[in-house]
Amino acid sequence: MKVLSVSSEVFPLIKTGGLADVVGALPIALKPYGVETKTLIPGYPAVMKAIRDPVVRLELPDLLGEAATILEVEHAGISFLVLDAPAYYSRTGGPYVDATGKDYPDNWRRFAALSLAGAEIAAGLLPGWRPDLVHAHDWQSALVPVYMRYYPTPELPSVLTIHNIAFQGQFGADIFPGLRLPAHAFSVEGIEYYGDVGFLKGGLQTAHALTTVSPSYAEEILTPEFGMGLEGVIASKAYNLYGIVNGIDADIWNPATDPMIAQTYSAATLKERAINRHRVVEHFGLEEDDGPIFCVVSRLTWQKGMDILAEVASEVVHMGGKLAILGAGDAALEGALFAAAGRHRGRVGVVGRHNEPMSHLMQAGCDAIIIPSRFEPCGLTQLYGLRSGCLPIVARTGGLNDTIIDANHAALQAKVATGIQFSPVTAEGLLQAMRRAMHLFQDRKVWTQMQKQGMKSDVSWGRSAERYAALYSSLVSRGA
């Protein structure tokens, strides 16, 4: 089976978040199931710099008013189709924002162009290769099924994955003519959304199947609390909505072989983690003692619950814990966490930028990782924690709820607990979880058992890929 995957970012070429990890890992995980994937991605400067010896596959002289070329290249085991369109993607900032952190004003055109290019490939314009199915990801490629619906193309099934429904790609109605869609596409059944153009909304309406990245999130987005205004549209498609938990690359996140950590180890040699712990202590300027180190590796945003973390930081220190925080985001939240570090020197350390090697070292050296998200479609950080023996302390929501077994009495008795869940997502809720963690940490036998149980968890892409392959086969066999 041939699948075209379309995404605005893919690891290892370009990454701003978990979307890139998922879209990069899935094609490799699907290979054993006979799925051949080509992944279409914008030709950002970082992408163009990273690829070697690309082959020109298709010229698009008028892609929404600009010239573009589709290049093909193999990189890190993935077959990439790179949309080389300098007018859209050759920018000095990031994939979505300029150097000052503001959205590019033409983001609607940049990602409509990506979607239209995907629809052109779906229609068979790429010489010698035509997909059996198209898989789009988030709002940036959600117009792929829209263009497939409204342009006269051969009928192909399409899948749209909602990685985070909070990001919807909503723009003023004045951009509609620039999309070059027929007039009737601007309707309730199409991309019209309360008088605006809704990229994600249009994709939800037109894709043949919808997936989210965990079963709990699939249920949550049917409710007003989590549906972000789109719960009605999703409910109308609920019969074709599937929650499939993400996996992680178990080779990259393998503490026995990880080149990014100071000392490798396994579930049988957990004492070796002490060397990694010492490096974390040095890097974050923490005091060296026997108390637990709680880490945070996250965007510093309200969604991720970082305001709650800032509120409880002093109390965690007074309990005897230490905090190592890695990430950047909202300026006010960054300021609050840096202020906590200033008040509690040696007990709270903050590094205000993401650093992939450091994130590996933190998971390999810290005792637990705090993930107090208000909503979390799937989450990957807790899976990295399981793999590394860094116990996740998570809000009971979305994929966090699906992947972590809470250390309640029954789970501890059965020796199946892998972390701590808490609700509600408030400062007091998090504090109660931290108190439980401090109590459990005192019994090193129980703590070690939980570490080993987490490290045994199957967090690879195996079962998830099997479910995606089954969904693909079902859609292709019944036709669009």
Swiss-Prot record:
ADP-alpha-D-glucose binds at K15. Pfam families: Glyco_transf_5 (PF08323), Glycos_transf_1 (PF00534). This is Glycogen synthase. GO terms for cellular component: cytosol. GO terms for biological process: glycogen biosynthetic process. The lineage of its organism: Bacteria, Pseudomonadati, Pseudomonadota, Alphaproteobacteria, Hyphomicrobiales. GO terms for molecular function: alpha-1,4-glucan glucosyltransferase (ADP-glucose donor) activity; alpha-1,4-glucan glucosyltransferase (UDP-glucose donor) activity. The keyword Secreted does not apply. InterPro entries: Glyco_trans_1, GS/SS, Starch_synth_cat_dom. Synthesizes alpha-1,4-glucan chains using ADP-glucose. Keywords: Glycogen biosynthesis, Glycosyltransferase, Transferase. The keyword Nucleus does not apply. Pathway: Glycan biosynthesis; glycogen biosynthesis. It comes from the Bacteria. Belongs to the glycosyltransferase 1 family. Bacterial/plant glycogen synthase subfamily.
